[in-house]
Amino acid sequence: MLRSFFLLLTLVLGFDSPALADDMPPDVLARTTTQEVLLILKQDKEMQNGNQTKVYQLVEAKILPNFDFNRMTQLAVGKHWPRATAKQKQSLVTEFRNLLVRTYSRALTEFSNQTIEFKPMTIKPEDTDVTVHSEIRQPGGQPIPIDYSMYKTAFGWKVYDVTIDNVSLVTNYRASFSSTIRQSGIDGLIKTLATQSARGTDKPAPRPGS
């Protein structure tokens, strides 16, 4: 299951877009605003007790705006993307997004005592695609490295892939998506994503050892 994978993802991708975020380096944006989300999680007893409405609102407001779901879905679908119709592409993006919303929301309710350390990095003015490095530290456990693949857009930096402990989110989903498409076609993948989202499962991309 991807539950622990997405818990880590949620903790470090929960950075909202404050004023002037468009001009803020990606590592600074992540480091400074992650603290806001961690504070909310620690103080909001309703979310800690599983209030899904509030959790969904937090995910929608502070986590998902930092993703480029179109690019992420295109990369996850891979070689099958060009032969999908415009309607199928939109459905794939929508259903993939819905699945991640539910997965992130469940992960938020499992937040406990993890802390985050962002690694120093140097970004040149001309850089448009970077990797932000960080570590999740857990009491009694080894640090877990997390890398964020981000690119610069007209609306600030966006995440298009995350690698946790050498496991790429996009690559994981690509393998699962490709298998489903071979068996059931693109419409079959859309149906599978919708079904998994509706029942709240994160089965499409099992993490090794989880």
Model-derived features: where do they sit?
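Solvent-exposed loop/turn segments at secondary-structure junctions
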Residues: 81, 98-99, 123, 137-138, ...
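Early exported N-terminus immediately downstream of N-terminal targeting peptides
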Residues: 23-104
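Short beta-strand edge/turn micro-motifs at domain boundaries
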Residues: 143-171
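Sec/Tat signal peptide C-region and signal peptidase I cleavage site
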Residues: 15-21
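Surface-exposed, charged secondary-structure patches
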Residues: 102-144, 196-210
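Low-complexity, intrinsically disordered terminal/linker segments enriched in charged
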Residues: 161-210
